[in-house]
């Protein structure tokens, strides 16, 4: 009896082994060539790459950081037995002395504000006086149906 060669199962194993080696040689899926591999997907190599590299937080977070920090809310700082104090505790529509650092209005505007505030409580409508420039100006021309047609 002579030596036999490899059987039909051996050639199938060799083919399977060769196929597995070829699969190992294939490259892994890669990202696009113009994107950084070690950064989030919105950091590109394009014209905004330098600007985007510093934005690692969400836009909502850095917008919130840009706003000035608000103090505690008025209703959070007072107990039930403690009356509120300070300018934020006053009602904005209630009359009272203005703070010393409040800007003063010109006398004409001040009287108009006081009259308007008084008429708001009584329900009387108040209109502002016309400006002196409007009194001396010519009346505006009336627009009729003929003004919309062409003068042919």
UniProtKB/Swiss-Prot annotation:
Propeptide: 65-152
Localization terms from the record: Secreted
Pfam families with a match to the protein in the record: NPBW (PF15180)
GO terms for cellular component: extracellular region
Signal peptide interval: 1-32
Regions annotated as coiled coil: none
Annotated PANTHER family: NEUROPEPTIDE B, NEUROPEPTIDE W
Function: Plays a regulatory role in the organization of neuroendocrine signals accessing the anterior pituitary gland. Stimulates water drinking and food intake. May play a role in the hypothalamic response to stress.
Family per record: Belongs to the neuropeptide B/W family.
Official protein name in the record: Neuropeptide W
Lineage, broadest ranks: Eukaryota, Metazoa, Chordata, Craniata, Vertebrata
The encoding gene: NPW
């Amino acid at each position: 009896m002579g030596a036999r060669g490899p059987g039909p199962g051996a050639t199938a194993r060799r083919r399977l082994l060769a196929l597995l080696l070829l699969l190992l040689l294939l490259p892994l899926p890669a990202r696009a060539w113009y994107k950084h591999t070690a950064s989030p997907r919105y950091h590109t190599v394009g014209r905004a790459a330098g600007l985007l590299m510093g934005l690692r937080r969400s836009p909502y977070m850095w917008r919130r950081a840009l706003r000035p920090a608000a103090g505690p809310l008025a209703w959070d700082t007072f107990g039930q037995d403690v009356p509120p104090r300070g300018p934020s505790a006053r009602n904005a529509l209630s009359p009272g002395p203005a703070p010393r650092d409040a800007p003063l209005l010109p006398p004409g505007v001040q009287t108009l504000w006081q009259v308007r505030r008084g008429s708001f409580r009584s329900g009387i409508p108040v209109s502002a006086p016309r400006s002196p420039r409007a009194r001396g100006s010519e009346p505006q021309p009336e627009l009729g149906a003929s003004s919309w047609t062409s003068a042919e």
